[in-house]
C-alpha cells in the first residue's frame, strides 16, 4: 500500500501540483488539501504519513513570507502538527514551505516531552529566520546543493550533489546567535549547503555570489530537526524529477538525485 501524503494548500501556494507529481513518481499517494478543509474537520491529519508544505506566496506573503501560513499551523493545528512531527513522520517544506516551518518554530525545533514547541506568537520561540536576499532581488535559476553529514532522513544517504531551481526573494537563512548556528552543526541539523564553483569536489560556496544565491549564513540551503524527519529547504527539488531521453547522462544523474530525495522520504514510512 502506498503511503498517503498530505500536500498542504493555502491561498497563494503554487507548487502543489509539482510536489504531488514528485511524490507520485517516488511511490506515494499524494492529496492536495486546502487548509480550510482541515480547519472544518473535513480532512484528518491522522490519515496521512507524509506532510509537504509546498512553495509559492502563501497569503501574498503579507506580514512576511510564510508568516500567516505559519500562524495557521501554530494556532489552529498546534496539537496535530506537534504529534505528526513527534511521531517521526516525514515532513518537507520547500521555499515558502521552509519559511513556514521556520516561522512556526517547527524548525530548527524546540521540544518538550517529545513534542515540538510551536510558536503561537510568531516570534517568541524563533531561533532562525529566512529574510530578504542579500543581493536585494528575486533569484530564479538552477543552483547546486551539497548534502551534508546530518540526521536528515531525506538527504543523508544521497550520493552526489543536487541540482534544482531556486525561485525566491526571501531565502537568506539567519540565526539569532552564533550559538544557535553552532548547535545546528553539532546536532547534525545542517542537511544541505550551496555548492561553489568547485561543488563537484564537495566545496561549498563560502558565501560567494551567485553560488550562494541569497547570502545565507554558512551557505545553508536546508536544515532538519534533531530527529531528522523534518526538512526545510529553499531550492525546488520537485522541479527536476522527470528524466527525458534527450538529456545527457550527467543531466539524467542530476535528475535522479532529486527524485532519490523524494524516494527517501517515501521509503522511510514503508
From Swiss-Prot:
Purpose: Part of the phosphoribosylformylglycinamidine synthase complex involved in the purines biosynthetic pathway. Catalyzes the ATP-dependent conversion of formylglycinamide ribonucleotide (FGAR) and glutamine to yield formylglycinamidine ribonucleotide (FGAM) and glutamate. The FGAM synthase complex is composed of three subunits. PurQ produces an ammonia molecule by converting glutamine to glutamate. PurL transfers the ammonia molecule to FGAR to form FGAM in an ATP-dependent manner.
Would you kindly state one Gene Ontology biological process term found in this protein's UniProt entry?
'de novo' IMP biosynthetic process
- The gene from which this protein is expressed is purQ
Asked if the record carries the keyword Cytoplasm, the reply is: yes
TM spans (from-to): none
Report the protein name in the record.
Phosphoribosylformylglycinamidine synthase subunit PurQ
The UniProt record lists the keyword Nucleotide-binding:
yes
Q: What is its main location?
A: cytoplasm
Amino acid at each position: 500500500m502506498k503511503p498517503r501524503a498530505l500536500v498542504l494548500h493555502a491561498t497563494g501556494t503554487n507548487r502543489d501540483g509539482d510536489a504531488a507529481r514528485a511524490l507520485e513518481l517516488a511511490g506515494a499517494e499524494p492529496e492536495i488539501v486546502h487548509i480550510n478543509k482541515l480547519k472544518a474537520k473535513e480532512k484528518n491529519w491522522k490519515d496521512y504519513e507524509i506532510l509537504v508544505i509546498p512553495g509559492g506566496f502563501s497569503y501574498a506573503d503579507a506580514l512576511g513570507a510564510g508568516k500567516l501560513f505559519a500562524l495557521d499551523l501554530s494556532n489552529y493545528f498546534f496539537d496535530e502538527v506537534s504529534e505528526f512531527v513527534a511521531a517521526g513522520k516525514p515532513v518537507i517544506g520547500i521555499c515558502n514551505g521552509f519559511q513556514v516551518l521556520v516561522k512556526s518554530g517547527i524548525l530548527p525545533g524546540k521540544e518538550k516531552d517529545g513534542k515540538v514547541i510551536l510558536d503561537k506568537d510568531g516570534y517568541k520561540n524563533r531561533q532562525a529566520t529566512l529574510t530578504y536576499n542579500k543581493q536585494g532581488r528575486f533569484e530564479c535559476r538552477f543552483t547546486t546543493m551539497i548534502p551534508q553529514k546530518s540526521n536528515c532522513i531525506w538527504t543523508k544517504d544521497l550520493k552526489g550533489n543536487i541540482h534544482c531551481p531556486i525561485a525566491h526573494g526571501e531565502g537568506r537563512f539567519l540565526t539569532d546567535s552564533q550559538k544557535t548556528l553552532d548547535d545546528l552543526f553539532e546536532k547534525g541539523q545542517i542537511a544541505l549547503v550551496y555548492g561553489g564553483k568547485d561543488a563537484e569536489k564537495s566545496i561549498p560556496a563560502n558565501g560567494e555570489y551567485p553560488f550562494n544565491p541569497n547570502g545565507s549564513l554558512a551557505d545553508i540551503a536546508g536544515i532538519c530537526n534533531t530527529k531528522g524527519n523534518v526538512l526545510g529547504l529553499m531550492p525546488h527539488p520537485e522541479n527536476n524529477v522527470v528524466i527525458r531521453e534527450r538529456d545527457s547522462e550527467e543531466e539524467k544523474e542530476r535528475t535522479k538525485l532529486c527524485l532519490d530525495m523524494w524516494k527517501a522520504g517515501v521509503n522511510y514510512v514503508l
